[in-house]
């Protein structure tokens, strides 16, 4: 083991759903010069799936160690016989499940396996065995078929990492970002009809603070001392138009949160009318948007940065980033999937 290896952060890259493009994009990035220069890739998932995908795609595959072997290693070390990366064999399908497995067709079995690889990676991060988690795309319906109650990665991370209790207001927030635009969501995977009732000033203040702190750290890492420029979107058309198109959410919830956050020194615009918040002129003067619900932030982000955006969970005691796309079952194991979002997620994950 070299001194260079000792200083490389260990990145747990989870497979995602085995039937989707997750195995492919992990295999196509693990030995790239960019990834190798930034960290030590640990591919968390079923080794049999990785090897089968590598054979079909004609690409290289790292060596394999079991999860138990990895956890038995000293936390600061990496396998000396695998200096470029390794598969941590976990989240396994049974022999019978492997026999009936078909790329592009998810199942309860692939849902259970992807869930297990994520929980193993979370536990490894919490215990200090890895420095960050980069998650591959899961199939939420497969999780549901497997009897898993969490609607997605973010809720699972919040619960398992000890940052929130299921059913209570979460301490974590979802941020989607690219070099073009960054959005933090106040609410995540809930029906649109429930959004207004879930908004409250205290939670929104935390969201604004997390958004500002994230941009501030990233600016500092890039050698910039410029303060973050934050925009907070309104909930309603035209930000409520002084109550004409709203039930006073802007006046009673959003404005008080903005005023409270300004007391912490943040530079904030808002509440902005959502239909004009993302124009080119606005984006030039805004570093990060705080959005009230899922599609308010993700529609502009995916329209502008579909192939190279990254999902970052804010407020966790560990670092977690993710690709900002789904499993793309129609492209699975064909060598056609873009790796840009995975590369961006790895860049954001490096401490």
Curated annotation (Swiss-Prot):
Binding, substrate: 153-154, 302, 311, 320
Highest taxon of the lineage: Bacteria
Top EC group: oxidoreductase
Keyword Plastid: no
E.C. number: 1.1.1.262
Pathway as given in its UniProt record: Cofactor biosynthesis; pyridoxine 5'-phosphate biosynthesis; pyridoxine 5'-phosphate from D-erythrose 4-phosphate: step 4/5
Record field: catalytic activity: 4-(phosphooxy)-L-threonine + NAD(+) = 3-amino-2-oxopropyl phosphate + CO2 + NADH
Primary site of residence: cytoplasm
Record-level GO cellular component terms: cytoplasm
Signal peptide start-end: none
Cross-referenced InterPro entries: PdxA_fam
Cofactor: a divalent metal cation
Localization of this protein: Cytoplasm
Binding site for a divalent metal cation: 189, 238, 294
GO annotation, biological process: pyridoxine biosynthetic process
Misc. remarks from the entry: The active site is located at the dimer interface.
Role: Catalyzes the NAD(P)-dependent oxidation of 4-(phosphooxy)-L-threonine (HTP) into 2-amino-3-oxo-4-(phosphooxy)butyric acid which spontaneously decarboxylates to form 3-amino-2-oxopropyl phosphate (AHAP).
UniProt protein name: 4-hydroxythreonine-4-phosphate dehydrogenase
């Amino acid at each position: 083991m070299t001194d260079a290896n000792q200083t490389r952060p260990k990145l747990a890259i989870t497979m995602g759903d085995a039937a989707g493009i997750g195995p492919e994009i992990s295999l196509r990035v693990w030995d790239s010069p960019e990834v190798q220069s930034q960290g030590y890739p640990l591919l968390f998932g079923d080794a049999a799936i990785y090897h089968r995908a590598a054979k079909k795609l004609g690409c290289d595959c790292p060596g394999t160690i079991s999860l138990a072997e990895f956890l038995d290693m000293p936390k600061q070390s990496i396998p000396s016989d695998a200096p470029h990366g390794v598969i941590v064999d976990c989240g396994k399908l049974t022999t019978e499940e492997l026999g009936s497995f078909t790329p592009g067709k998810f199942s309860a079995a692939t849902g259970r396996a992807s869930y297990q690889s994520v929980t193993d990676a979370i536990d490894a991060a919490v215990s200090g065995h890895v420095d960050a988690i980069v998650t591959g795309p899961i199939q939420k319906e497969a999780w549901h078929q497997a009897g898993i109650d969490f609607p997605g990665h973010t809720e699972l991370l919040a619960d398992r990492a000890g940052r929130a209790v299921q059913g209570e207001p979460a301490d974590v927030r979802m941020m989607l970002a690219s070099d073009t635009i960054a959005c933090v969501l106040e609410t995540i995977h809930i029906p649109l009809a429930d959004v207004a009732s879930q908004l409250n000033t205290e939670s929104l203040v935390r969201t604004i603070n997390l958004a500002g702190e994230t941009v501030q750290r990233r600016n500092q890492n890039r050698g910039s001392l410029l303060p973050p420029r934050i925009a907070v979107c309104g909930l309603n058309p035209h930000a409520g138009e002084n109550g004409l198109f709203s039930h006073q959410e802007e006046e009673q919830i959003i404005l008080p949160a903005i005023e409270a956050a300004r007391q912490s020194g943040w530079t904030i615009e808002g509440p902005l009318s959502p239909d004009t918040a993302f124009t080119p002129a606005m984006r030039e003067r805004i570093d990060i948007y705080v959005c009230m619900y899922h599609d308010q932030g993700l529609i502009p982000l995916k329209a502008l940065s579909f192939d190279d955006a990254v999902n970052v969970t804010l407020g966790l005691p560990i670092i977690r980033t993710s690709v900002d796309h789904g499993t793309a079952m129609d492209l699975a194991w064909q060598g056609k999937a873009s790796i840009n979002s995975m590369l961006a997620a790895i860049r954001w994950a490096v401490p």
